């Protein structure tokens, strides 16, 4: 690669910037002060142009994109014509209620500790849930396996086995391997 060729591709300081790029730079320049804008290199300006384009594309597609940091806290309108500073809902952020331990107890069922099963009694203890929707009713009738137990019986490997052993298949026909000698050994 020739070193002179790389310098020929770079724009010089006084070079004319194409109109399309200049328009994109003008869109971005309003987010910065004149001093900041003059200190920036062309490559930094291009990065900001692409950041704004990606943000606009994501929001047009309906995704919730994070507003780039350079676009925040400036008195400008966004690409859809909405004025950020005059938005009445701007400062009203929705506060989500925090989950406390008491609320979590109300949502998740209380699981009773398992007692050792007596020899004569085959039925299992079933955890009960307390809360407004269950009012102490049993979740599953005794003697019937729960859904998770059914799933484990059908698909899951047994304890003590390796996780991949249930994936191995048995060969239907016995394979006999023969020892193949090297041609170099036959020459002796």
From Swiss-Prot:
This is Protein SSX3. SUPFAM superfamilies: KRAB domain (Kruppel-associated box). The keyword Transcription regulation applies. GO terms for biological process: regulation of DNA-templated transcription. Residues 20-83 form the KRAB-related domain. It holds the Pfam family SSXRD. The modification Phosphoserine is found at residue 123. Keywords: Phosphoprotein, Transcription, Transcription regulation. Could act as a modulator of transcription. Interacts with SSX2IP. One of its GO terms (cellular component) is nucleus. It comes from Homo sapiens. The gene is SSX3. Belongs to the SSX family. InterPro entries: aKRAB, KRAB, KRAB_dom_sf, SSXRD_motif. Residues 115-127 have a biased composition (Basic and acidic residues). PANTHER family: PROTEIN SSX3, SYNOVIAL SARCOMA, X MEMBER. Residues 113-162 are annotated as: Disordered.
């Amino acid at each position: 690669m020739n070193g002179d060729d790389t310098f020929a591709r770079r724009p010089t300081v006084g070079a004319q910037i194409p109109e399309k790029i200049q328009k994109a730079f003008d869109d971005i320049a309003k987010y910065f002060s004149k001093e900041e804008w003059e200190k920036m290199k062309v490559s930094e300006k291009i990065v900001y142009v692409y950041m704004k384009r990606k943000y606009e594309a994501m929001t047009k597609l309906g995704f919730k994109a994070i507003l780039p940091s350079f676009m925040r806290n400036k008195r400008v309108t966004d690409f859809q014509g909405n004025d950020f500073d005059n938005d009445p809902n701007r400062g009203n952020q929705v506060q989500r209620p925090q989950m406390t331990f008491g609320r979590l107890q109300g949502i998740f069922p209380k699981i009773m500790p398992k007692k050792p099963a007596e020899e004569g009694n085959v039925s299992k203890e079933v955890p009960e849930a307390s809360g407004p929707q269950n009012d102490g009713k049993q979740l599953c009738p005794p003697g019937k396996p729960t859904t998770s137990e059914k799933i484990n019986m059908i698909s899951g490997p047994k304890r003590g086995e390796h996780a991949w052993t249930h994936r191995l298949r048995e060969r239907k026909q016995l394979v006999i391997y023969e020892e193949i000698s090297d041609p170099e050994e036959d020459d002796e």
